[in-house]
Protein backbone atom coordinates (compact mmCIF):
# COMPACT_ATOMS: atom_id res chain seq x y z
CA UNK A 1 0.00 0.00 0.00
CA UNK A 2 1.29 3.46 -0.93
CA UNK A 3 1.53 5.84 2.02
CA UNK A 4 2.65 8.91 0.09
CA UNK A 5 3.38 9.88 -3.49
CA UNK A 6 4.09 13.05 -5.40
CA UNK A 7 6.42 14.83 -7.78
CA UNK A 8 8.71 17.83 -7.82
CA UNK A 9 11.54 19.53 -9.67
CA UNK A 10 15.00 19.63 -8.14
CA UNK A 11 18.27 21.34 -8.96
CA UNK A 12 18.58 23.46 -12.06
CA UNK A 13 19.40 27.08 -12.65
CA UNK A 14 17.71 30.40 -13.41
CA UNK A 15 18.81 32.51 -16.37
CA UNK A 16 18.13 36.25 -16.37
CA UNK A 17 18.19 38.37 -19.52
CA UNK A 18 19.17 42.02 -19.85
CA UNK A 19 15.61 43.10 -19.02
CA UNK A 20 15.42 41.02 -15.87
CA UNK A 21 13.19 38.32 -17.35
CA UNK A 22 13.82 34.85 -15.97
CA UNK A 23 14.07 31.32 -17.36
CA UNK A 24 14.06 28.30 -15.02
CA UNK A 25 15.74 25.26 -16.55
CA UNK A 26 18.21 22.36 -16.35
CA UNK A 27 16.39 20.85 -13.36
CA UNK A 28 15.44 17.21 -12.89
CA UNK A 29 11.85 15.97 -12.57
CA UNK A 30 11.15 13.44 -9.82
CA UNK A 31 8.14 11.19 -9.20
CA UNK A 32 8.22 9.34 -5.89
CA UNK A 33 6.21 6.78 -3.96
CA UNK A 34 6.61 5.76 -0.33
CA UNK A 35 5.01 2.52 0.86
CA UNK A 36 3.51 1.90 4.27
CA UNK A 37 6.30 0.63 6.51
CA UNK A 38 9.02 1.85 4.15
CA UNK A 39 12.51 0.47 4.54
CA UNK A 40 15.30 2.71 5.76
CA UNK A 41 16.87 3.67 2.44
CA UNK A 42 14.94 4.78 -0.65
CA UNK A 43 16.00 3.76 -4.15
CA UNK A 44 16.74 6.52 -6.66
CA UNK A 45 16.55 5.40 -10.29
CA UNK A 46 18.62 7.00 -13.08
CA UNK A 47 17.89 6.23 -16.73
CA UNK A 48 20.32 5.99 -19.64
CA UNK A 49 20.85 7.54 -23.06
CA UNK A 50 17.75 8.27 -25.12
CA UNK A 51 15.53 7.25 -22.21
CA UNK A 52 13.61 8.77 -19.33
CA UNK A 53 11.95 7.40 -16.19
CA UNK A 54 9.82 5.05 -18.30
CA UNK A 55 12.83 2.70 -18.17
CA UNK A 56 11.83 1.71 -14.65
CA UNK A 57 8.04 1.74 -15.05
CA UNK A 58 5.78 -0.75 -16.84
CA UNK A 59 7.80 -2.95 -19.22
CA UNK A 60 7.25 -2.73 -22.99
CA UNK A 61 5.21 -5.96 -22.85
CA UNK A 62 3.04 -4.69 -19.99
CA UNK A 63 4.50 -6.28 -16.85
CA UNK A 64 5.58 -4.52 -13.68
CA UNK A 65 8.97 -2.84 -13.80
CA UNK A 66 11.42 -2.09 -11.00
CA UNK A 67 9.27 0.82 -9.82
CA UNK A 68 6.45 -1.48 -8.69
CA UNK A 69 8.61 -4.51 -7.92
CA UNK A 70 10.63 -2.63 -5.32
CA UNK A 71 7.68 -0.62 -4.06
CA UNK A 72 6.03 -3.97 -3.27
CA UNK A 73 9.22 -4.89 -1.42
CA UNK A 74 8.67 -1.81 0.77
CA UNK A 75 11.31 0.44 -0.71
CA UNK A 76 10.49 4.07 -1.35
CA UNK A 77 11.18 4.71 -5.03
CA UNK A 78 12.25 7.92 -6.74
CA UNK A 79 12.05 7.91 -10.54
CA UNK A 80 14.00 10.71 -12.17
CA UNK A 81 13.96 12.42 -15.54
CA UNK A 82 17.40 13.99 -15.71
CA UNK A 83 17.82 17.59 -16.94
CA UNK A 84 17.04 18.10 -20.64
CA UNK A 85 15.13 14.83 -20.87
CA UNK A 86 11.48 13.75 -20.66
CA UNK A 87 9.48 15.75 -18.11
CA UNK A 88 12.61 17.79 -17.39
CA UNK A 89 12.91 18.98 -20.99
CA UNK A 90 13.25 22.68 -20.15
CA UNK A 91 16.91 22.97 -21.03
CA UNK A 92 18.87 26.21 -21.06
CA UNK A 93 20.42 25.73 -24.51
CA UNK A 94 19.09 26.48 -27.96
CA UNK A 95 18.61 23.23 -29.83
CA UNK A 96 16.92 21.85 -32.93
CA UNK A 97 15.43 18.37 -32.69
CA UNK A 98 15.12 16.43 -35.93
CA UNK A 99 13.91 12.83 -36.37
CA UNK A 100 16.79 10.34 -36.40
CA UNK A 101 15.89 7.19 -38.30
CA UNK A 102 18.00 4.95 -36.10
CA UNK A 103 15.67 2.51 -34.33
CA UNK A 104 17.21 -0.51 -36.04
CA UNK A 105 20.60 0.67 -34.78
CA UNK A 106 19.33 0.73 -31.20
CA UNK A 107 17.70 -2.70 -31.62
CA UNK A 108 21.22 -4.03 -32.24
CA UNK A 109 23.09 -1.83 -29.79
CA UNK A 110 20.68 -2.67 -26.98
CA UNK A 111 21.26 -6.36 -27.82
CA UNK A 112 17.71 -7.41 -28.57
CA UNK A 113 19.12 -9.07 -31.67
CA UNK A 114 20.55 -8.27 -35.09
CA UNK A 115 17.83 -6.41 -36.93
CA UNK A 116 15.31 -7.72 -37.86
CA UNK A 117 16.09 -11.00 -36.08
CA UNK A 118 15.92 -11.56 -32.33
CA UNK A 119 18.67 -13.34 -30.46
CA UNK A 120 17.88 -16.96 -29.67
CA UNK A 121 16.57 -17.12 -26.11
CA UNK A 122 16.47 -13.35 -25.68
CA UNK A 123 14.46 -12.17 -22.66
CA UNK A 124 12.28 -9.93 -24.81
CA UNK A 125 8.74 -10.65 -25.99
CA UNK A 126 8.75 -11.10 -29.75
CA UNK A 127 5.63 -9.31 -30.96
CA UNK A 128 4.96 -6.08 -32.81
CA UNK A 129 3.19 -4.32 -29.94
CA UNK A 130 6.08 -4.89 -27.53
CA UNK A 131 8.61 -3.60 -30.04
CA UNK A 132 6.37 -0.61 -30.77
CA UNK A 133 6.25 0.25 -27.06
CA UNK A 134 10.00 -0.30 -26.77
CA UNK A 135 10.82 2.22 -29.48
CA UNK A 136 8.28 4.73 -28.15
CA UNK A 137 10.00 4.96 -24.77
CA UNK A 138 12.94 6.71 -26.42
CA UNK A 139 13.12 10.48 -26.14
CA UNK A 140 15.60 13.16 -27.25
CA UNK A 141 18.04 15.19 -25.20
CA UNK A 142 17.01 18.85 -25.27
CA UNK A 143 20.53 20.26 -25.33
CA UNK A 144 24.06 18.90 -25.12
CA UNK A 145 24.98 15.88 -23.02
CA UNK A 146 26.50 17.28 -19.82
CA UNK A 147 27.32 14.95 -16.93
CA UNK A 148 27.99 17.94 -14.67
CA UNK A 149 24.49 19.32 -15.21
CA UNK A 150 22.96 15.88 -14.70
CA UNK A 151 24.93 15.03 -11.58
CA UNK A 152 24.27 18.45 -10.05
CA UNK A 153 20.55 17.70 -10.20
CA UNK A 154 20.89 14.18 -8.79
CA UNK A 155 23.11 15.47 -5.97
CA UNK A 156 20.48 18.09 -5.17
CA UNK A 157 17.91 15.30 -4.99
CA UNK A 158 19.98 13.24 -2.53
CA UNK A 159 20.62 16.36 -0.47
CA UNK A 160 16.85 16.92 -0.36
CA UNK A 161 15.68 13.40 0.52
CA UNK A 162 18.63 12.21 2.60
CA UNK A 163 20.54 8.91 2.45
CA UNK A 164 19.56 6.44 -0.27
CA UNK A 165 20.77 3.90 -2.81
CA UNK A 166 21.47 5.03 -6.37
CA UNK A 167 20.30 2.62 -9.11
CA UNK A 168 21.74 3.62 -12.49
CA UNK A 169 21.55 2.36 -16.06
CA UNK A 170 23.80 2.76 -19.11
CA UNK A 171 24.70 6.45 -19.55
CA UNK A 172 23.36 6.88 -16.03
CA UNK A 173 26.40 4.91 -14.88
CA UNK A 174 28.93 7.73 -15.30
CA UNK A 175 26.31 10.16 -14.01
CA UNK A 176 26.27 8.06 -10.86
CA UNK A 177 30.06 8.08 -10.52
CA UNK A 178 29.96 11.87 -10.84
CA UNK A 179 27.07 12.34 -8.42
CA UNK A 180 28.85 10.36 -5.69
CA UNK A 181 31.48 13.10 -5.54
CA UNK A 182 28.87 15.81 -4.90
CA UNK A 183 26.80 14.44 -2.02
CA UNK A 184 27.38 12.39 1.13
CA UNK A 185 23.92 10.83 0.96
CA UNK A 186 24.62 8.02 -1.51
CA UNK A 187 24.94 4.87 0.61
CA UNK A 188 25.56 2.49 -2.32
CA UNK A 189 25.38 2.28 -6.11
CA UNK A 190 23.92 -0.52 -8.23
CA UNK A 191 24.59 0.02 -11.92
CA UNK A 192 23.12 -1.89 -14.86
CA UNK A 193 25.40 -1.97 -17.91
CA UNK A 194 27.20 1.32 -17.24
CA UNK A 195 29.08 2.84 -20.14
CA UNK A 196 31.41 5.81 -20.47
CA UNK A 197 33.66 8.05 -18.36
CA UNK A 198 35.01 5.31 -16.08
CA UNK A 199 37.29 7.09 -13.57
CA UNK A 200 40.84 5.78 -13.09
CA UNK A 201 43.73 7.32 -11.13
CA UNK A 202 45.98 9.69 -13.02
CA UNK A 203 48.79 7.80 -14.70
CA UNK A 204 47.05 4.44 -14.23
CA UNK A 205 44.62 4.39 -17.15
CA UNK A 206 44.69 0.78 -18.43
CA UNK A 207 44.95 0.10 -22.15
CA UNK A 208 41.44 -1.37 -22.05
CA UNK A 209 40.13 2.07 -21.00
CA UNK A 210 41.62 3.84 -24.02
CA UNK A 211 39.30 2.41 -26.66
CA UNK A 212 37.12 4.86 -28.56
CA UNK A 213 33.41 4.09 -28.28
CA UNK A 214 30.77 4.37 -30.98
CA UNK A 215 29.99 7.74 -29.41
CA UNK A 216 33.56 8.75 -30.38
CA UNK A 217 34.75 9.15 -26.80
CA UNK A 218 37.44 7.34 -24.85
CA UNK A 219 35.84 4.96 -22.37
CA UNK A 220 38.07 5.82 -19.42
CA UNK A 221 39.00 9.13 -17.82
CA UNK A 222 41.79 10.07 -15.43
CA UNK A 223 41.07 11.59 -12.02
CA UNK A 224 43.27 12.42 -9.00
CA UNK A 225 43.89 9.49 -6.66
CA UNK A 226 41.95 11.33 -3.95
CA UNK A 227 38.90 11.32 -6.22
CA UNK A 228 39.38 7.67 -7.18
CA UNK A 229 39.43 6.74 -3.51
CA UNK A 230 35.93 8.15 -3.06
CA UNK A 231 34.65 5.06 -4.89
CA UNK A 232 36.07 2.85 -2.15
CA UNK A 233 33.77 4.40 0.45
CA UNK A 234 30.45 2.85 -0.61
CA UNK A 235 29.52 -0.65 -1.84
CA UNK A 236 29.02 -0.87 -5.60
CA UNK A 237 27.54 -3.66 -7.70
CA UNK A 238 27.59 -3.72 -11.51
CA UNK A 239 25.54 -6.01 -13.75
CA UNK A 240 25.90 -6.91 -17.43
CA UNK A 241 23.55 -9.04 -19.51
CA UNK A 242 23.96 -11.67 -22.21
CA UNK A 243 24.96 -11.94 -25.87
CA UNK A 244 28.35 -10.32 -25.44
CA UNK A 245 30.50 -11.50 -28.36
CA UNK A 246 34.14 -12.51 -28.08
CA UNK A 247 35.14 -10.74 -31.32
CA UNK A 248 34.61 -7.27 -32.77
CA UNK A 249 32.76 -8.46 -35.88
CA UNK A 250 29.76 -6.45 -34.62
CA UNK A 251 31.27 -3.32 -32.98
CA UNK A 252 27.92 -2.21 -31.54
CA UNK A 253 27.78 -5.47 -29.57
CA UNK A 254 31.47 -5.88 -28.81
CA UNK A 255 31.54 -2.47 -27.16
CA UNK A 256 29.60 -4.01 -24.25
CA UNK A 257 32.04 -6.91 -24.01
CA UNK A 258 34.87 -4.42 -23.66
CA UNK A 259 32.93 -2.51 -21.02
CA UNK A 260 32.37 -5.64 -18.96
CA UNK A 261 36.10 -6.40 -19.09
CA UNK A 262 36.98 -2.83 -18.18
CA UNK A 263 34.64 -2.73 -15.21
CA UNK A 264 36.25 -5.89 -13.86
CA UNK A 265 39.62 -4.12 -14.03
CA UNK A 266 38.11 -1.06 -12.35
CA UNK A 267 36.61 -3.20 -9.60
CA UNK A 268 39.93 -4.93 -8.90
CA UNK A 269 41.78 -1.62 -8.70
CA UNK A 270 39.22 -0.27 -6.23
CA UNK A 271 39.11 -3.47 -4.19
CA UNK A 272 42.90 -3.46 -3.98
CA UNK A 273 42.51 -0.05 -2.31
CA UNK A 274 39.96 -1.35 0.19
CA UNK A 275 36.83 -0.88 -1.90
CA UNK A 276 33.75 -3.09 -2.14
CA UNK A 277 32.94 -3.45 -5.83
CA UNK A 278 31.28 -6.50 -7.38
CA UNK A 279 30.83 -7.09 -11.12
CA UNK A 280 28.24 -9.67 -12.13
CA UNK A 281 27.86 -11.11 -15.62
CA UNK A 282 24.30 -12.42 -15.46
CA UNK A 283 24.87 -15.63 -17.48
CA UNK A 284 27.54 -16.61 -14.95
CA UNK A 285 24.91 -16.61 -12.19
CA UNK A 286 22.32 -18.49 -14.23
CA UNK A 287 20.38 -15.66 -15.90
CA UNK A 288 20.53 -15.96 -19.67
CA UNK A 289 19.25 -13.91 -22.59
CA UNK A 290 19.28 -10.50 -20.94
CA UNK A 291 19.46 -7.40 -23.11
CA UNK A 292 20.83 -3.97 -22.27
CA UNK A 293 17.67 -3.49 -20.16
CA UNK A 294 17.70 -6.28 -17.54
CA UNK A 295 15.22 -4.31 -15.42
CA UNK A 296 12.50 -4.72 -18.04
CA UNK A 297 13.46 -8.09 -19.52
CA UNK A 298 11.13 -11.08 -19.22
CA UNK A 299 13.11 -12.34 -16.21
CA UNK A 300 13.19 -8.99 -14.42
CA UNK A 301 11.85 -10.55 -11.22
CA UNK A 302 14.96 -12.75 -11.04
CA UNK A 303 17.11 -9.72 -11.86
CA UNK A 304 15.40 -7.80 -9.06
CA UNK A 305 15.96 -10.73 -6.69
CA UNK A 306 19.71 -10.44 -7.24
CA UNK A 307 19.59 -6.77 -6.31
CA UNK A 308 17.44 -7.48 -3.25
CA UNK A 309 19.93 -10.11 -2.10
CA UNK A 310 22.83 -7.70 -2.56
CA UNK A 311 21.03 -4.93 -0.67
CA UNK A 312 20.40 -7.37 2.15
CA UNK A 313 24.02 -8.51 2.35
CA UNK A 314 25.10 -4.87 2.60
CA UNK A 315 22.51 -4.10 5.32
CA UNK A 316 20.80 -1.62 3.01
CA UNK A 317 17.28 -3.04 3.27
Q: What is each model feature region?
A:
Residues 1-38:
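N-terminal cap/lid segment of alpha/beta-hydrolase-fold proteins
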Residues 289, 293-317:
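Catalytic active-site module of serine/aspartate enzymes centered on a nucleophile-bearing elbow/loop
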Residues 40-49:
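Short beta-strand element of the alpha/beta-hydrolase
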Residues 167-176:
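Gly/Ala-rich beta-loop-alpha elbow adjacent to hydrolase catalytic centers
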Amino acid sequence: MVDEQGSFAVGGTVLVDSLGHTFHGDHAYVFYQKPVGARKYPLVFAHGVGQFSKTWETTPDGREGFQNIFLRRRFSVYLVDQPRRGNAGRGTESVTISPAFDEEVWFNRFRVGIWPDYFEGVQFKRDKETLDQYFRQMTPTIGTTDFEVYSDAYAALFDKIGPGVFITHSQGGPVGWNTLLKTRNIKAIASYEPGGAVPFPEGQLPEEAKFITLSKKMEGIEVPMSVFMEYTKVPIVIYYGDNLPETDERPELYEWTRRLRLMKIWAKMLNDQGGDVTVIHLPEVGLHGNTHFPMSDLNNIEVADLLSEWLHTKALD
